[in-house]
């Protein structure tokens, strides 16, 4: 079954290669770009499949040599076979992953929302730590981070911070970060040295494009008001802050970071569209979960997904039972140590669901 699919992919790859060299196609910019993207997606599958076929031919050749009259040739073939068979098995696993249904949001930018939860000032400080962690990870990936909305805490950190992270395949790397993040550490103000537990919630929403969400302007209520600082005092004499309410869903977004009302409105609309898209996706996922047990990347935000224990230098991801004693590096943005095992875990779940 899988090999029939792979043959179809290779046939389509050859067809697309031919089309990309057709002058008529080259002259149609939109069509040419679509085919270029498809060619890039197919090429990764085809490269592994062709390597799989080459290794399979080598295995067959070595098996034939086992019957050779020359004892040295037989011994050489026998010695090479285990390594070739192991390599072929690795390639087969890669192909299974490559043929999994693609998440249509993987290539998208994200809206990152971090909110302080239980724990008061400590939770707000941890929200700041999490934002720095994600910002440094983004910097390492060559992504751009743009703050959309900030609610500062007087003790430092954030009550809430919303940012846009844009770049190559951002959602694919950050989609498993949605959930409740718990921190255990001794606050600087704690004289007795007792460990306090605080929590923040993280939401990672794929950036909504106009084609994803159709919002009727008559469904929006837009309020303008004067921006205020951390202590509640007004910091702007003009009504530049914007609050947008989507009446049918009750989704409310406020933005006051920019001095221009127009810019605040544009930022608020981006967040609003992404939140509504997230609601639509959540409804769809709930429907899918009723049909199949495994729900990949559902990002259930009521779930405690990770604990950061500072006294022990430990970070534990509860979804996959992974514990790393490299907390300092993780907080500095070395998130790949968590992202890669999570991705592999959910890919394995998806493969098991396909084979069931």
From Swiss-Prot:
Primary location recorded for the protein, binned into one broad class: cytoplasm
PTM comment, free text: Methylated by PrmC. Methylation increases the termination efficiency of RF1.
Source organism per UniProt: Syntrophotalea carbinolica (strain DSM 2380 / NBRC 103641 / GraBd1) (Pelobacter carbinolicus)
Lineage: Bacteria, Pseudomonadati, Thermodesulfobacteriota, Desulfuromonadia, Desulfuromonadales
KW Transferase (keyword) present: no
Record flagged with keyword Flavoprotein: no
Entry-linked PANTHER family: LD18447P (PTHR43804:SF7)
Localization terms from the record: Cytoplasm
GO molecular function: translation release factor activity, codon specific
Coiled coil: none
GO CC, any one term: cytoplasm
Similarity comment: Belongs to the prokaryotic/mitochondrial release factor family.
Pfam families xrefs: PCRF, RF-1
InterPro entries reported for this sequence: PCRF (IPR005139), Pep_chain_release_fac_I (IPR000352), Pep_chain_release_fac_I_sf (IPR045853), Prokaryotic/Mito_RF (IPR050057), RF-1 (IPR004373)
Protein name, as recorded: Peptide chain release factor 1
Keyword terms of this UniProt record: Cytoplasm, Methylation, Protein biosynthesis
Top-rank lineage group of the source organism: Bacteria
SUPFAM superfamilies tied to this protein: Release factor
Role: Peptide chain release factor 1 directs the termination of translation in response to the peptide chain termination codons UAG and UAA.
Modified residues (N5-methylglutamine): 233
